């Protein structure tokens, strides 16, 4: 009886057939998702919702917007006037002083809330027009301050602001 060594247990014998590999069962490589800061759209009325970005780059997108800050026109910009409730009305530049997170879209002639754009979750029940201030835009200037104040006091807005503060304060690396 011949002694077998450890290697003989693992060496291939010519009688076995090689395992077949099927190229169709291999998973295709997913293209690498990249985000460039140049992809940032400054006008809030033209932006796509944050949740429409791939989850792999969503934080990068949020960080780029946070670094850029809210879109606020320079003093002297002429806001278009609309006939509303029997008067000519328009967005007022001094509202930026009271609401530092307020944004204005030239494309839609509408107001947006920066924190709500970044951290609004559309799956949650909508109260106080959260989606309007995050993605659609508010354009009823007669009651704008009343609506801004009501929304700013809402849990949705407060949570968005806290989430933004937490997001800005998180460490980018553990070292």
Protein language model regions, located:
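N-terminal leader/early-domain signal
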Residues: 1-175
């Amino acid at each position: 009886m011949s002694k077998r060594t450890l290697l003989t247990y693992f060496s291939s014998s010519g009688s076995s057939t090689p395992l077949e590999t099927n190229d169709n069962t291999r998973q295709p490589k997913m293209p690498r998702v990249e985000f460039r800061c140049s992809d940032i759209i400054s006008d809030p009325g033209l932006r796509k919702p944050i949740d429409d970005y791939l989850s792999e780059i969503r934080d990068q997108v949020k960080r780029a917007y946070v670094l850029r800050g809210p879109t606020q026109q320079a003093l002297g910009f002429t806001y278009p006037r609309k006939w509303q409730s029997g008067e000519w009305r328009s967005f007022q530049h001094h509202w930026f002083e009271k609401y530092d997170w307020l944004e204005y879209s030239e494309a839609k002639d509408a107001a947006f809330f920066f924190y709500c754009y970044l951290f609004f979750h559309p799956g949650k029940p909508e109260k106080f027009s959260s989606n309007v201030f995050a993605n659609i835009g508010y354009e009823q200037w007669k009651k704008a301050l009343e609506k801004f104040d009501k929304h700013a006091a809402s849990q949705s807005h407060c949570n968005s602001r806290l989430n933004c503060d937490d997001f800005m304060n998180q460490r980018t690396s553990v070292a």
